[in-house]
């Protein structure tokens, strides 16, 4: 029961100088793995070249994943800079990480998870929101289990209900 999970969006940040892997849950799982912990990225990518590339990058980094291939495009965020260099983000909707399925494998992972970091952004669509909540409900209860809620208030991709429900379910709150 010592697995640490980053659950939610795995995507490409499309910057003026090119694309790079993005998504707070994936970054969380990667950085945790750098400290020697057994971590997993839980997400979905499309059955497309962008999805293939994300899986390849994670494999090259030695990052363990539980990523489903789904019939939606792999997520992207268009990043542009305004006149004074402040980044603006256009987060595409109807993408793979909006549709993370709850599978038997995911249930088994939840039963062996010590800590999970999940965010508000990945709950913008009902399918992934249901999966995240089922994962949280399946995890063992106890003081040693950490349920870290990463609030991300971007582009209006949240509701009061999602925020309140997630705050009730977590025992660690990360405010960005």
Q: Regions from the language model: what does each represent?
A:
Residues 3-4, 13-86, 93-100, 104:
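Substrate-binding N-lobe of the ribokinase-like
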């Amino acid at each position: 029961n010592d697995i640490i999970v980053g659950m939610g969006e795995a995507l490409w940040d499309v910057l003026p100088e090119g694309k790079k892997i993005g998504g707070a849950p994936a970054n969380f799982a990667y950085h945790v793995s750098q400290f020697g912990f057994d971590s997993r990225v839980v997400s979905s990518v499309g059955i497309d070249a962008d999805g293939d590339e994300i899986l390849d990058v994670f494999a090259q980094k030695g990052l363990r994943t539980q990523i489903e291939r789904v019939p939606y495009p792999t997520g992207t965020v268009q990043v542009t800079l305004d006149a004074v260099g402040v980044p603006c983000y256009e987060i595409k909707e109807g993408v793979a990480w909006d549709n993370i399925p709850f599978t038997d494998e995911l249930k088994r992972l939840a039963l062996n998870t010590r800590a999970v970091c999940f965010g508000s952004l990945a709950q913008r669509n009902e399918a992934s929101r249901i999966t995240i909540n089922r994962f949280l409900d399946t995890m063992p209860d106890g003081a040693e289990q950490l349920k870290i809620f990463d609030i991300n208030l971007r582009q209006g991709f949240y509701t009061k209900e999602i925020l309140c429900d997630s705050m009730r379910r977590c025992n660690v709150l990360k405010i960005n």
